[in-house]
Amino acid sequence: MKNDSRLRKYVPSLLLLLLFEAVAVTLWFTKDNLFYLLNFSYIGGCMALGTALFTAGKRYARHFVQLAVGGYMLLYLGVISRENMQIEGFWYYLFLGTFEAATIHYAVAKIFGPLLFGRGWCGYACWTAMALDFLPYKRPQKPRREKLGVLRYVMFALSLALVTGLFLMKVAYLEQIMFWLFLAGNALYYLAGIALAFAFKDNRAFCKYLCPVAVFLKPMRYFSLLRVHCDESKCVHCVKCCLLYTSPSPRDAHE
């Protein structure tokens, strides 16, 4: 019985692996490209292993997944394969009318996937957060400034306007431009992320105030099957969650 209960806690990791394998096989056959099988099998395997290690209490689990998945997407898909996996790349492929690269990535990780695993992308796979999580402010030391959250919508609108403008002006060598935008965009994200982390004494300040991807993730997480909820009937009002997330109440800390 003890073995059964121990194994049961790894079911979410197994389901996550099966989900990615289903996506991998489906895209392999529909797109007739072996890359999708290898790509999503690798990502799903890393995610499943990382969440299983996290469940087992291994402190390095999340960093392992971030480096394995985030590093792969940044260096191999982004730099070596020259695919813009940022939000500008999503708009680019969307306007081209093709379901590949960034459009597939966004559909799986940031638009429909969060209905199952919430903001798992932010915690386990984002290559920006991968670097920011090594900074010294793992626990926010200042209250969250809710009004600054509007900046993420500004970033979202600017990225859309930028790519729309490039298409409307029929700029030549657009594919090469998107690659350089990927490099420049990531450099700016890292610089802004580090600056905000030290300014607000919070590693994830960039995620809270500037990240445009949150515009997709924020509404989806409310319907997530794996969303963390506050069970008020079991709350002992220790306020640890409030201190950790600098929130005024336990309910707000888990929202």
Model-derived regions, located:
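Non-ligating segments of multi-cofactor redox enzymes
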Residues: 1-243, 251
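Single conserved hydrophobic/aromatic residue that forms the stacking wall/gate
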Residues: 248-255
